[in-house]
């Protein structure tokens, strides 16, 4: 029997760094790596997210985070408390932090087409820069406020679910 066409052999040969298990909240993410996570408190949020974020840094992956501008410093402090050298990661291009106005709410409103393009650009850029993966963490509390375009959020998430399977990168 010729095993050269055996799909199992092909998968073994295709094994790369990006095929390492990606852990989140005590589970391993599968092929679908878009997770919507809800938390009861900031402490719970960081108890779940910090090991996921740290794992990416330990593997020399890129981190791209979007946060509430009012919580920027607290977010950076939480990363530092996990042993992440944020200034070094920023200088090395391994970490980028944007606030809502520079991502979801450019020009003061949510434009789903523009946001979908940004996510694809970020994930493509990470690959082009030589990172095995980009771990994208996006805080979306802005969606609870009355920003123009927020009514398009469900459609945006649906469209995002059609785009993300093209990538191995986890998006939380």
Question: What is each model feature region?
Answer:
Residues 1-172:
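Non-catalytic regulatory/interaction regions at protein termini and inter-domain linkers
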């Amino acid at each position: 029997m010729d095993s050269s066409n055996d799909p199992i052999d092909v998968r073994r040969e295709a094994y790369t760094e990006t095929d390492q298990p990606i852990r989140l909240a005590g589970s391993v993410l599968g092929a679908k790596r878009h997770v919507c996570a809800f938390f009861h408190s900031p402490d719970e949020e960081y108890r779940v997210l910090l090991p996921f974020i740290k794992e990416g840094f330990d593997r020399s992956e890129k981190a791209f985070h979007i946060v509430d501008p009012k919580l920027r410093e607290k977010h950076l402090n939480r990363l530092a408390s996990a042993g992440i050298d944020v200034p070094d990661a920023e200088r090395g291009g391994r970490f980028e932090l944007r606030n809502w106005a520079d991502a979801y709410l450019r020009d003061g409103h949510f434009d789903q087409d523009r946001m979908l393009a940004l996510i694809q650009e970020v994930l493509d850029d990470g690959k082009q820069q030589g990172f095995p993966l980009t771990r994208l963490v996006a805080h979306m509390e802005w969606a609870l406020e009355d920003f123009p375009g927020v009514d398009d959020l469900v459609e945006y998430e649906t469209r995002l679910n059609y785009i993300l399977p093209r990538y191995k990168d986890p998006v939380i």
